[in-house]
């Protein structure tokens, strides 16, 4: 505390020049004693606080400086929740025009702003306005400490909107371009803290922060790079911001792609996350690939860092949504590492993104389909199908449903014994899992050359295909009923004597179909629909793959007209089946 003591002693030489009142002289004497024993005393109450406060309100500049220095040193060592009585004199000092006092007062306030309760009280007491004024000054040390204090204040959610609307964002943005690295770090850190809500992000964009953040991606300082990449990643969460970025920041993607090769792991991770968020939009999905993002991503998903793996697999998942990227992703060598990530049982999220990416790649070209099967993806998904979290099962079942849509894939799936996984998955209590598995199963019953796998799985595992058909027919859920009826219709039209025999001689299935016909007929009659007029099933596209029907039914649950259409479709299929059986 030598600085403060020295200041007190210097001031005593100027007594004749600088007036000191008796109570100020007493406060100086007491404070010098307190400072000698500072480790055992509480400077936030009682005598020490009273002595400091007396000096703050003095007209003597040296005494004010001494008080500011004392507050700075004490708060650096002892940080805890304090009262208004402590903050008030510091806020008074903050309004001083003296640079020494400004530096120390900002430092003291920033130290106390580490405490969560103090953060709220400082803002409530009007601390933002003097801090903003100090940021707009010319003294680098003052700027640095003022910005640092606002950075701390902005970590409390209650303060974020108040800061965003206080006028602080424009000077913070300006200071982010400072030539002084400490000021730049604090300013970009403060801007980052303002990106955690949509409203504040909008204020930040309107304050002109985005071009500054993008320009600072080229900074040589890893902390500044980290703050800027993270801030931009958060800003890119909002669709409106992504559109604005696409219009105004043509170099953003190339800069972020370059940062995926940063020596700093956290910069690398945040750059990848920023690209993932941007890749929510179609245009960015293409641009990231054009900018050379794939080689970086294929390396990152094979790294040893879980955050890097998660960020990169989430990014490639979004990029793989665009059909034009599918072949390029396969050619870049993503299939083997993606299949390997399916074993990443410590991270459900990584598994989900990996399966989702594989699903997007599965239904592209014949070349990609062939490589997909050769990669072992189907085998691995089958292994995980019954032994993974529901979220992963949902992605796997969706992948199977997509694969089963393509006629060229059906026999390969059957040969891979996919029915051993699909049939048990139809028992899932999760409708996405059971519905996707059932849709895949139904599609595998349609337009195939070899029905041996269907026949051998008729009553096993877990009651087999027969059990699935019965359960779904009796589910009282229109989408599931439709899947079962559609599967029965496909089997009835298989031209396979054994399959047809199994259908025709299963009284439970036939009775369920007849019951469904009666139920749907009654529904239509009650709705006033003329079944004979509208029920020309010969003209309907009932032989299309089942996913389109399934999706349509899922979407048509609110409108009475759509409900009637769904009932009519179910009725038509029952009539086709019964016509065949008769």
From Swiss-Prot:
Keywords, comma-separated and alphabetical: Lipoprotein, Membrane, Myristate, Palmitate, Repeat, Vacuole
Domain of life, source organism: Eukaryota
UniProt cross-references to InterPro entries, sorted A to Z: ARM-like, ARM-type_fold, Armadillo, Vac8
Membrane topology: Lipid-anchor
Annotated Basic and acidic residues bias: 536-549
Cross-referenced Gene3D superfamilies: Leucine-rich Repeat Variant (1.25.10.10)
Gene Ontology BP terms: Cvt vesicle assembly; establishment of organelle localization; nucleus-vacuole junction assembly; pexophagy; piecemeal microautophagy of the nucleus; protein localization to membrane raft; protein localization to phagophore assembly site; protein-containing complex localization
UniProt function note: Functions in both vacuole inheritance and protein targeting from the cytoplasm to vacuole.
Membership in a protein family: Belongs to the beta-catenin family.
Protein name: Vacuolar protein 8
Gene coding for it: VAC8
